[in-house]
Amino acid sequence: MSVALQPCLFDEAPQGEEEVGLRPLSAAHRTALGRGAWIDVLPGWLTGADRLFERLVATVPWHAERRQMYDNVVDVPRLLSFYGEDEPLPDPALDAAHAALDTHYGPELGEPFRTAGLCYYRDGRDSVAWHGDTIGRGSTEDTMVAIVSVGQPRALLLRPRGGGPVVRHPLGHGDLIVMGGSCQRTWEHAVPKTARPVGPRISIQFRPRGVR
């Protein structure tokens, strides 16, 4: 059973469409990856996710970036938007998700999630390469990164840093994955390009202070 968000925050859902809401986080399933890393996965945590996807596409100030890659400056293959500690999130549903994550994971994490980064994968050509969130504290400390996905599913891959078996989770339509413990420094994750026809997806990454 999901908990609907305050009706005053949203237009009434069209007939046959699910209201935007959140399912209990107690239903998340934890998997130990080894070396102190773990992931929690909760499919369909955010209900009415397709409505939220449409709102975020229309209202978030998306922008493209270019980054130095060895001797070249290249386009980042996805659109981005970032919300720092003092910036309001672009939709009340994200405020509710943020609060729920803090309530559930705050005691284990020892601090709240502070920032939100949004990535818009427009089609199978958009991607993110293998990496860990190791800019800042994630390189030396255990931490958590919570990712909510809306829109069409894309595969999030995880593998041990240095190589090893790949763990695959298709994420979309309100799915949640939380990467915790040593995951950012002992494992890597990626959203690879795909030649298959896939629809667009937005991921929302909640992080504590000093983790990027």
Model-derived segments and spans:
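Non-heme Fe(II) oxygenase metal-center motifs and adjacent flexible, charged/small-residue loops
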Residues: 1-212
